[in-house]
Amino acid sequence: MDVDALLQSIPPLAVYLLVSGVVGVESLGIPLPGEVVLVSAALLSSRHDLAVSSIGVGVVAVIGAAVGDSIGYAIGRRFGMPLFDHLGRRFPKHFGPGHVALVERLFNRWGVRAVFFGRFIALLRILAGPLAGALKMHYPRFLAANVSGAICWAGGTTALVYFAGMAAERWMERFSWIALIITVVVGIIAAILLRERTSRIIAELEMEYKNRRH
């Protein structure tokens, strides 16, 4: 079975369930590659020989993000900040003091806007819901920022990838694979540099946290 035949054998419903499930669980506070799954599904929707709908992908991603964040909010509100102390000891790579301190600082600086813009930042996307609940953010304000952020993030990402996928097909007809590879490499390098900068900030905050405790 070739790749095209394999892709055509995937039921659209399975794609929609995967997108909503992974995005929802990530929004709940569990580190999963929600954005990777969303981008992959959006790329599938850009192929006209497949039955996956770009609108369907965007809608289920919005639902998954909004519901997952709300569940995360409820968990955070129920267990409070001790929840993050426990998770930090169990999973320091994702919930260490530096991670929580960075997100809490952004919440203190941006308020409810951190929920909206957090949808576009991996670390905030995971922690925004539970931390908003733990900090007792007013739920209607949280919900408004949560839903609007989910619509902009999921809808915007799906539309961008969908049109980029169609443009890439036309681009490869006119130019070459080399130009496309160069573009992808530049994008990967930019993502790595941004990730390293975030890691440095987290490391500094963790050191600051340890110094305060001593």
Curated annotation (Swiss-Prot):
Listed transmembrane segments: 10-30, 55-75, 147-167, 174-194
Major site of localization recorded for this protein: membrane
Transmembrane found in the keyword field: yes
UniProt keyword list: Cell membrane, Membrane, Transmembrane, Transmembrane helix
Any Pfam family the entry gives: VTT_dom
UniProt family annotation: Belongs to the DedA family.
Name listed for the protein in its UniProt record: Uncharacterized membrane protein ML0467
Record organism: Mycobacterium leprae (strain TN)
